[in-house]
């Protein structure tokens, strides 16, 4: 029988981002308890030799699996060293690859307090309304007028440590033009 290949979209990331992601996930699973129901799988619990960790995030009847890899083909720069992340959405027997922004949006829909379009209706019904969003990485579009008004009223408080963002984990830092300065410290040059 011939070899069968399976192609998986893997976002090339810095190994320090993977360490930060893992520590943030563990903190919010075990210390702050904001990531209830999340499951962390260590590298020694996986059958695949290139998988360094897995985070299973339940979303009602579906699951989001964020899998980090090591020992992949080395990148263009020294610090990339073959580390990557894949994001998979599973529901029963169906699974598909998704991008980091969609993953953040899905996490935002099911976890963490947020001021949303339904907040005015909740306030009229006498329910508690959260005036801020705990997971701003999940907002990938311009907010509603009510959300923007609430944001202007409430001063944002920085969360320490921040909530884990898949978009931040898989952010492309290498292809952005680097800002450099000439010998007189004038920001006239752009990557040259």
Swiss-Prot record:
It comes from the Viruses. GO terms for molecular function: metal ion binding; RNA binding. The BC-like-box motif mediates the interaction with elongin BC complex. Residues 158-192 are annotated as: Disordered. Residues 171-172 are annotated as: Membrane association. This is Virion infectivity factor. Its main location: host cell. Zn(2+) binds at residues 108, 114, 133, 139. Homomultimer; in vitro and presumably in vivo. Interacts with viral RNA and Pr55Gag precursor; these interactions mediate Vif incorporation into the virion. Interacts with the viral reverse transcriptase. Forms cullin-5-RING E3 ubiquitin-protein ligase complex (ECS complex) by interacting with host CUL5, RBX2, elongin BC complex (ELOB and ELOC) and CBFB/CBF-beta. Within the ECS complex, Vif interacts directly with host CUL5, ELOC and APOBEC (APOBEC3F and APOBEC3G) substrates. Keywords: AIDS, Host cell membrane, Host cytoplasm, Host membrane, Host-virus interaction, Membrane, Metal-binding, Phosphoprotein, RNA-binding, Ubl conjugation, Ubl conjugation pathway, Virion, Zinc. Pfam families: Vif (PF00559). It comes from Human immunodeficiency virus type 1 group M subtype G (isolate 92NG083). The modification Phosphoserine is found at residues 144, 165. Counteracts the innate antiviral activity of host APOBEC3F and APOBEC3G by promoting their ubiquitination and degradation. Acts as a substrate recognition component of an E3 ubiquitin-protein ligase complex: mechanistically, Vif hijacks a host cullin-5-RING E3 ubiquitin-protein ligase complex (ECS complex) and the transcription coactivator CBFB/CBF-beta to form an active E3 ubiquitin-protein ligase complex that targets APOBEC3G and APOBEC3F for polyubiquitination, leading to their degradation by the proteasome. Vif-defective viruses show catastrophic failure in reverse transcription due to APOBEC-induced mutations that initiate a DNA base repair pathway and compromise the structural integrity of the ssDNA. In the absence of Vif, the virion is morphologically abnormal. Residues 169-186 have a biased composition (Basic and acidic residues). It is found in: Host cytoplasm; Host cell membrane; Virion. InterPro entries: Vif. Residues 40-44 are annotated as: Interaction with host APOBEC3G. Residues 14-17, 74-79 are annotated as: Interaction with host APOBEC3F. GO terms for biological process: viral life cycle. Processed in virion by the viral protease. Highly phosphorylated on serine and threonine residues. Residues 75-114 are annotated as: RNA-binding. Induction: Expressed late during infection in a Rev-dependent manner. Residues 151-180 are annotated as: SOCS box-like. The keyword Ubl conjugation applies.
